[in-house]
Regions:
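C-terminal catalytic histidine-bearing segment of alpha/beta-hydrolase fold enzymes
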Residues: 161, 177, 181, 187-248, ...
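Beta-strand-rich modules
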Residues: 304-324
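Active-site machinery of serine-nucleophile hydrolases
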Residues: 57, 64-113
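Gly/Ser-rich "nucleophile elbow"/oxyanion-hole loop immediately N-terminal to the catalytic nucleophile
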Residues: 48-53, 98-138
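Pro/Thr/Ser/Gly-rich low-complexity, intrinsically disordered linker/stalk tracts
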Residues: 240-278, 321-337
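Primarily recognizes the serine-hydrolase "nucleophile elbow" in alpha/beta-hydrolase
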Residues: 123-124, 130-172
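A domain-start/cap signature at the N-terminus of enzymes
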Residues: 20-57, 135-137, 142, 147, ...
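Solvent-exposed loop/turn segments flanking beta-strands in beta-repeat/beta-sandwich domains
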Residues: 54, 270-288
Length: 337
């Protein structure tokens, strides 16, 4: 426990622009700073809020000692214009307790107050209780695992960046869609805190979890996450009680040996039914029946530049935003001289 507390009190610089409250409120007319029972929090309301409509809410949990108001991406017009969303950004001034963790059975005081604020917002605004989301960085990443394990069914989905969890909590994390991010060379929060709980979730049958590890990246993996172009769409595609179909199998997979002995794969983009669910989230590419890589679903080609000599067999699986997978594609063979 002491090791976890030591990790959580490290100062974390996050992937956002630092602004004063005055600057934020000037830039975003619907951003307010409020207090509730000693908890300071920022609340971003969608522009042109209409109580007759229903809106999602995203909860952001910051890292240790990072209590400054920040211009997070969820406020940006590029997201809000397509998906008007409430954003709640509470501030935790006690990094020794933080947002909680999965090594304890109770919420931290800051998380207790945050959940009370969420309940008050649900009562006051037209927020869809089936579309509550949470994400966090470092100390906030630990908080994501903590609140999802202690409040099963409250949140529709979440993502955790350079945080972590005990493996023992895996059984409580099986049913909430979760995307875990970590840098392989994290020098503040060891990658094992994310890697091992992911492996345990999968071992226990979890089907709605994804793990992305960035090779050679240290604690600042939030910079890589900021470049994940499907992240916001994936999160908002999740909703409690929502049912959707699986994507079609990848069609027309072809493999061509290039002059430099790399292998270029091309395919036709499959659709997902119903069409309203959107395009494929990502593809799994397999070489010789082993997972080679995962790539975004809007791509239709990939070059394998790391194959040894000999014959190699490739196939693919399409994964929808609901985690459902297609049947495997046909296999294609390539021989590298």
């Amino acid at each position: 426990m002491k090791a976890i507390n030591a990790i959580c009190i490290v100062l974390t610089t996050v992937m956002t622009v630092q602004l004063s409250f005055a600057q934020l409120s000037a830039k975003y007319k619907t951003y307010e700073q409020k207090w509730s029972k000693g908890l300071r929090y920022g609340l971003f309301k969608p522009a042109n809020y209409d109580p007759k409509k229903s809106y999602p809410l995203v909860l952001y949990l910051h890292g240790a000692n990072d209590t400054i108001s920040r211009d997070i991406t969820w406020y940006h017009e590029s997201i809000q214009s397509e998906n008007p969303t409430f954003v709640l950004a509470p501030k935790c001034t006690n990094p020794n307790q933080g947002w909680g963790n999965t090594w304890t059975d109770v919420h931290s005081p800051a998380m207790v107050k945050t959940l009370q604020v969420i309940d008050s917002l649900l009562a006051r605004y037209s927020i869809n209780k089936n579309r509550l989301y949470v994400y966090g960085i470092s100390m906030g990443g630990f908080g994501v695992f903590s609140v999802l394990s202690k409040e099963p069914g409250k949140f529709a989905a979440g993502y955790a960046i350079c945080g972590g969890s005990s493996e023992a909590a895996a059984s409580k994390l099986l049913n909430t869609p979760l995307w875990i991010f970590h840098g392989s060379d994290d020098d503040v929060v060891g990658v094992q805190y994310s890697r091992q709980v992911y492996q345990e979730i999968k071992k226990e049958g979890g089907q709605v979890v994804r793990y992305t590890e960035y090779p050679g990246v240290r604690h600042n993996s939030w910079e890589n996450v900021a470049r994940e172009k499907t992240l916001h769409r994936w999160l908002l595609a999740q909703a409690k009680g929502k049912t959707t179909n699986s994507p079609h199998s990848v069609d027309g997979l072809k493999a061509k040996l290039q002059n430099d002995n790399t292998v270029n794969l091309t395919w036709s983009t499959p659709t997902v039914e119903p069409k309203s669910h959107g395009t494929v989230w990502y593809y799994k590419i397999f070489r010789d029946n082993k997972l080679l890589t995962e790539i975004d679903g809007d791509l239709s080609d990939f070059t394998d530049s790391d194959s040894n000599r000999g014959m190699h067999r490739y196939h693919m699986i399409a994964v929808a935003y609901n985690f459902k997978e297609s049947t495997p594609s046909s296999f294609v063979n390539v021989t590298i001289p």
